[in-house]
């Protein structure tokens, strides 16, 4: 009784407040579900069952009353109650609604065409679908697959950003007022922030969706996956369909809808063949033509020659320009200078020579142009229009781009125009060693300066300071460029202005024909150099999945793992009976020819560069020692032969021979790179792929270890018998024993028994004796 009296008193006290009295007398506060939700903190034991029980009620959800009325959703449809005008006790201006209200909205509500918005939101997923449509599936093979768990990118992106950088970009794009202090990334890439803001402005997207889109646009979604073969993102996103532990599904994964990716692939292939041709000491031009004609790329479902694709592209990058000039194709009035692309707008310069002093002592000549000319320039995200005359950059207007790209574009334009004090006296850190390549070729001074600004940020800013610093006119604040590449600088660089948008490249219908010198310099009919091998950017490690390099010199450009397999396969094919095959060279102890086999040279670029001399010393010693003692295995010799090509060098050997992709072979030990079984000498396994060893001498159709040699019979192995070649058998006397390689890694001892007798006759006689005894 006392408990009920206490509750009644508390109820009377609460009813003194009008709002509390309304909540106590109106609404669903007596509903068990609502009452329990607001009066307990106990964790629900069976939330799924509770949800089903709650949804079975008449009005299990709440909805905004104003939105229901604006959407003209009735309270009842087809005798089914959709909502009622009863205000919910937990949220103001919301009323109770049924699950049928959602169905009515979906099927009878206002129609909205969100197809374009959906494509924009799920752009990465639609892109993946398009790439899958372009795949050309090939044969399915069952074999042991050597997979390694590696961190790989599973989504192609236009620009890769780190996780912290993506979060900064999201905050500065979506929450400008709440964003933290600008990080170095935001300061250097504020142009990207403005681009993203303008991209998503006035679009019917909430901020959570835009944040998702930004993450998908710049995040390559790195994962640790068991992979094999090439690791391009286009391939990694469907690695689960390309192979398992015991099967491989061959497929080409080039993206024909991605124009930028095709252009990058074209540049990468052209850069590789140009650098490979430049490594040739003589006839670099003819080598480049050979490489181009022997290379093909898959475009869509067809494979096309590189020499057909190069004339069709309008790319003016230096690597593509060099390949075009090698083929003699026409080119627009464009030229390259390092990684910067240029197009002349007007003017015609006259070439003049001048002198710069290295370390104040050595005079080095360089060339410049005396007449006024105007150019369009492009570097990454930044573009520019500029004018040069004599040895100066008269003016330049830079459009778009981030601060870092604007700085480097201005520096390259200054070097191109020979502007600044460094074309009178060279920087103190430039020495005479910087003026020549490793092959002893002279490097023009302007390219020496290009290499110099790439070494450090201090060198870049020192060159920009030589342009001259002036006080910024307050009326031009925002249009002048500071030393850091920004617009709002108190002090700016002389005659340098910035505009917000990019500058469009002017069209040029005039075509010119280029010539290519043996030094890989492309020049026009007037002798002006348009592109040179020195313009090529530093080589990058690129894996080619859809490019075929048929020339033997370019085998190393394939996937390194594939190149190693092909190299060992070529060496195993040398286990024949010819004069220049491996067994004959071993029998003659012609080590020099053995170490310089074309197959050995082919694998030389795959060796770890800083250890090649040490590996050569150890490998050569292993080969010579085993051959001299007569106790050797051809399988073991094949394993270490690729490491014998280079000149020997003293050094510490760790017991393993490493390739440049960190795979290795170890003498006397089988591993995934190279392995075999003594029980089956007919196969050698390289990266899980079985390579068949040549069969016996004289009979390619018999899978046996007997040599069918007239006048000889097989006898018990005698290690004291001399090792001879097949051509030397004619000199073997009656009753003498010799050892001869017979195939599949086997060496047998033979004895001269007669002039017209062979091992096959011994086999036939034994078969007859067995039949007679039975």
Curated annotation (Swiss-Prot):
Superkingdom of the organism of origin:
Viruses
Tell me one Pfam family matched here: Flu_PB2_1st
Q: Where in the cell is it found?
A: Virion; Host nucleus
Keywords, alphabetical: Cap snatching, Eukaryotic host gene expression shutoff by virus, Eukaryotic host transcription shutoff by virus, Host gene expression shutoff by virus, Host nucleus, Host-virus interaction, Inhibition of host RNA polymerase II by virus, mRNA capping, mRNA processing, Viral transcription, Virion
Q: Which cysteines are joined by disulfide bonds?
A: none
Q: Which GO terms describe its cellular component?
A: host cell nucleus; virion component
Q: Which family does it belong to?
A: Belongs to the influenza viruses PB2 family.
Name of the protein described by the UniProt record: Polymerase basic protein 2
The organism named in the record is Influenza C virus (strain C/Berlin/1/1985)
